[in-house]
C-alpha cells in the first residue's frame, strides 16, 4: 500500500459547497492514474474481498476501473450500476445521495439469489453504497462483501443499514490535508 499512501500526500482537496472533496487518481481519474498504483490497489482488493461470488458489482463511474481489473483477473462477470436508464427488462432504479449531489442509478443483470461483491473507490457519506445495498437486497441478491479503497472516517448512511464495508485505508480531511488513520 506504499504507492497508495504516498499518492495521498499530493492529493488536492477542493471545496464543493462546504464539502471537502478529495481529488485522487483512484477516486477521480485525475491526476493521471499510474498503472503501478492501480495494480497495487487491485491486488489488495483481491486479497481483501470475498470473491466466492457470481458477480462483481460496481457503481459508475469510479468503481468501474477497479472492478474491471478484478474481473479480468478472476473471470467473475462484472455488473456496472449505471447513471443512465436503458429500459431493459428487469432494470431496477435507485436514488443515490452523496455529500455533493443526488441522482438516479440503474441496476441490470442481477437476479434473486446472485452472490455479489460490491467494489468501489470511496466510502464518504455512504449515500451511494447504502442505496445500492438496499436495491440489491430488494432484488434478492446476497451481498457477500463490500470493499472500498478509501473510507472517510465519520458517520455514513451505510451505518443505518445491516451492511458493512471493508476499506483498504481510512482517512479524514483536516485543514485541507489528507490524514490516514
From Swiss-Prot:
InterPro entries per the UniProt record, alphabetical: HGPRTase-like, PRibTrfase_dom, PRTase-like, Pur/Pyrimidine_PRTase
Entry EC no(s): 2.4.2.-
Root EC class: transferase
GO molecular function: transferase activity
GO biological process: purine ribonucleoside salvage
Keywords of the record: Purine salvage, Transferase
The keyword Transferase appears for this protein: yes
Name of a matching Pfam family: Pribosyltran
Family (UniProt): Belongs to the purine/pyrimidine phosphoribosyltransferase family. Archaeal HPRT subfamily.
Role of this protein: May catalyze a purine salvage reaction, the substrate is unknown.
Name by which UniProt lists this protein: HGPRTase-like protein 2
